[in-house]
Amino acid sequence: MSTLQRRRVNRADSGDTSSIHSSANNTKGDKIANIAVDGDDDNGTNKKIAYDPEESKLRDNINIPTLTLMEEVLLMGLRDREGYLSFWNDSISYALRGCIIIELALRGKIRILDDSARKRFDLSERLIEVIDSSKTGEVLLDETLQLMKNDEPLSISNWIDLLSGETWNLLKINYQLKQVRERLAKGLVDKGVLRTEMKNFFLFDMATHPIADASCKEAIKRRVLSVLVSRNMELSYNEYFPETTSFKIIRTLALICGSYGANVLENVLTTLEYEKRDKAISRAEEIMAQFSQYPFDLEKETELGVSVNLNKEVKEEIENNPGHDLQLEVIAGVFEVFSRMDMLL
């Protein structure tokens, strides 16, 4: 039995938002609030439109980029022309499950169970609860959310193990997410980032996914290098990652930590000189250690002279998005799992 199979386990789910109704008299017990919005009907007269405030919250307060965190990590591991991942990478599958947990937290779907006794446990051992089971439109996220919703609260590390199929619990063996890499690649094809080609490998044909839009991957690389190489971090934005993205700094840190855990970070650093590449890896490890605890240690300054403004930017981002501490605690817990992956694998 491999050491990878000695980990732990656990869950997921998804649900639908409540339907929208308008009425003249709303009672206090109504779950759906009717909020009037002025609009013009066909006759030019003003008309009131009712909508679900939960939908408005997701649309206006949580701005989601085009690509999920899992898709960005997969892109960093893909060979541009060949369109497939390294056959020797046994870390990426486990890391992608962790990225699913982070993505759900960034979207406000899950958080750490608010129990004062939780602080006796490591971050990765704290329990997760679902706070919004509405569908995201991303199949892997919705599948995971549905599993979480239907099960009791389980720890971060339990969930990553379960989604990876690393469990001895036969009742939960079906929690393993199937064909994650292939499904992510097909999602990127649908978004116009990759294309599908059939290539012959000895005796069989295999679907590969070469890069169709090189600008997307280059933008991801620039964002990573801005944090790991530049003295002052300054993120670049595009149609895939707009400036209005919620928690854009923390999402970028999650990309770096997820890529490090998936053993694909060095793919971005191949064009750098040896010394710069070594310093970038050291900075990634420094970030992993700093942000795998919560509250984040924002008083600790980097010793490498790289992205010296990172702490200030993260502090401002958290202050501008109050009330998300328990979601950020989930992210820190996954970072803790990533930091131990060498021992786990």
Swiss-Prot record:
Binding site for a 1,2-diacyl-sn-glycero-3-phospho-(1D-myo-inositol 4-phosphate): W88, R97, K178, R181
Beta-hairpin required for oligomerization: region residues: 197-208
Residue spans of biased composition, Polar residues class: 15-26
InterPro entries registered for this protein in UniProt: GPP34-like (IPR008628), GPP34-like_sf (IPR038261)
Modified residues (Phosphoserine): S14, S19
Main location: Golgi
Compartments, record wording: Golgi apparatus, Golgi stack membrane
Disordered as annotated region, ranges: 1-26
One term of GO molecular function: enzyme binding
Membrane topology value: Peripheral membrane protein
Biological process terms in GO annotation: endoplasmic reticulum unfolded protein response; Golgi organization; Golgi to plasma membrane protein transport; Golgi vesicle budding; protein N-linked glycosylation; protein O-linked mannosylation; protein retention in Golgi apparatus; regulation of phosphatidylinositol dephosphorylation
Cellular component terms per the entry's GO annotation: cytoplasm; cytosol; Golgi apparatus; Golgi cisterna; Golgi cisterna membrane; Golgi medial cisterna; Golgi membrane; nucleus
A Pfam cross-reference name: GPP34
Record's keyword terms, sorted: Golgi apparatus, Lipid-binding, Membrane, Phosphoprotein, Protein transport, Transport
Other observations noted: Present with 1850 molecules/cell in log phase SD medium.
Function: Phosphatidylinositol-4-phosphate-binding protein that links Golgi membranes to the cytoskeleton and may participate in the tensile force required for vesicle budding from the Golgi. Thereby, may play a role in Golgi membrane trafficking and could indirectly give its flattened shape to the Golgi apparatus. May also bind to the coatomer to regulate Golgi membrane trafficking. May play a role in anterograde transport from the Golgi to the plasma membrane and regulate secretion.
Subunit description: Homotetramer. Interacts with coatomer complex. May interact with ARF1.
Family: Belongs to the GOLPH3/VPS74 family.
Name the record gives this protein: Vacuolar protein sorting-associated protein 74
UniProt organism field: Saccharomyces cerevisiae (strain ATCC 204508 / S288c)
